[in-house]
């Protein structure tokens, strides 16, 4: 008798949970960000990227222009505008040990670790009314091996800045696509 009551209640509970889960999943708004029906690609192609200062800022801007329109360049008539402000810093992450294994203590002449931290603040506005749609700050870090030779160190730092600029542009583009896809 008790097992019949338990069996009946377990079937009722299972049915209720199935109906509840179906209701929750029906309200789910998951859709592809770059899908055909979303129109996000067309909106991204209508975004112009304003001029920015500095070499790394120009790298981010060039990559954003390429990513927004799929290599087609700036739009002739932009519906949206994005202003990007980029800053970058390169530092050594060398750790000083006291067991005579550091570069300074044993004439180590190999590369030592470093990193480039790049931050970008951007503002996305609608051209027609000047409304700010999104304003955010993103940052990325690129690791780098810094050799002892000065020119090689400059080149390695520049390569790390270029990698960080490409990554920052992709993050900003994804963020803008999510904003325009709403």
List each language-model region with its residue ranges.
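Bacterial N-terminal signal peptides that target proteins for export
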Residues: 2-17
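C-terminal motif of bacterial Sec signal peptides marking the signal peptidase cleavage site
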Residues: 23-27
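Bacterial signal peptide processing site
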Residues: 29-32
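Post-signal peptide N-terminal segment of mature Sec-exported envelope proteins
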Residues: 37-59
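Surface-exposed short loop/turn segments
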Residues: 71-137, 143-159
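C-terminal/domain-edge helix-coil "capping" segments
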Residues: 128, 152-182
């Amino acid at each position: 008798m008790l097992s019949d009551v338990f069996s009946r209640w377990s079937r009722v509970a299972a049915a209720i949970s199935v109906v509840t889960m179906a209701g929750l999943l029906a309200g789910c708004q998951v859709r592809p960000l770059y899908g055909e029906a979303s129109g996000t690609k067309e909106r991204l192609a209508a975004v112009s990227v304003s001029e920015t200062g500095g070499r790394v800022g120009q790298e981010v801007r060039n990559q954003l222009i390429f990513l927004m329109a799929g290599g087609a360049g700036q739009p002739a008539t932009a519906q949206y505008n994005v202003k990007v402000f980029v800053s970058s810093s390169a530092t050594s992450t060398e750790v000083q040990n006291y067991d005579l294994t550091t570069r300074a203590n044993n004439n180590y002449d190999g590369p030592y670790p470093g990193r480039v931290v790049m931050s970008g603040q951007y503002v996305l506005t609608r051209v027609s009314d000047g409304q700010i749609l999104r304003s955010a700050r993103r940052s990325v870090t690129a690791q780098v091996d810094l050799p002892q030779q000065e020119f090689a160190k400059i080149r390695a730092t520049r390569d790390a800045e270029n990698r960080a600029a490409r990554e920052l542009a992709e993050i900003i583009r994804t963020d803008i696509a999510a904003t325009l896809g709403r």
